[in-house]
From Swiss-Prot:
Named cofactor requirement(s): [2Fe-2S] cluster
Record flagged with keyword Iron-sulfur: yes
Pfam families linked: Fer2
Effect of residue 49 to A: No effect on electron transfer
Subunit relationships: Forms a complex with heterodimeric ferredoxin-thioredoxin reductase (FTR) and thioredoxin.
Organism listed in the record: Nostoc sp. (strain PCC 7120 / SAG 25.82 / UTEX 2576)
Swiss-Prot/TrEMBL keywords: 2Fe-2S, Electron transport, Iron, Iron-sulfur, Metal-binding, Transport
Gene: petF
Keyword Iron-sulfur among UniProt keywords: yes
Protein purpose: Ferredoxins are iron-sulfur proteins that transfer electrons in a wide variety of metabolic reactions.
Annotated cofactor note: Binds 1 [2Fe-2S] cluster.
Residues that coordinate or bind [2Fe-2S] cluster: 42, 47, 50, 80
Protein name: Ferredoxin-1
Length: 99
């Protein structure tokens, strides 16, 4: 099992946190376990509350059912169902940017 460095950036609050996330754990779950409060609602990849934008790196979010292909190509991720597949940098709190 690999572990990756996930950097979570909240531009609105000016915060940046680095966490370690195993490749078999969702980013949202790992962030909560490490004391970081990210937005969420359904925890099933079926809404956009936890949306973030990938700045760099790759994730597996094949469990999600909300984002369309254009949004995924634009770099949007649902942290509740995203596994890191490399070190990643994600801008959090991006739900409003989807619309």
């Amino acid at each position: 099992m690999a572990t990756f460095k996930v950097t979570l950036i909240n531009e609105a609050e000016g915060t940046k946190h680095e966490i370690e996330v195993p490749d078999d754990e969702y980013i949202l779950d790992a962030a909560e376990e490490q004391g970081y409060d990210l937005p969420f609602s359904c925890r099933a990849g079926a809404c956009s509350t936890c949306a973030g934008k990938l700045v760099s790196g790759t994730v597996d979010q094949s469990d999600q059912s909300f984002l369309d292909d254009d949004q995924i190509e634009a770099g949007y991720v649902l942290t509740c169902v995203a596994y890191p597949t490399s070190d990643v940098v994600i801008q959090t709190h991006k739900e409003e940017d989807l619309y």
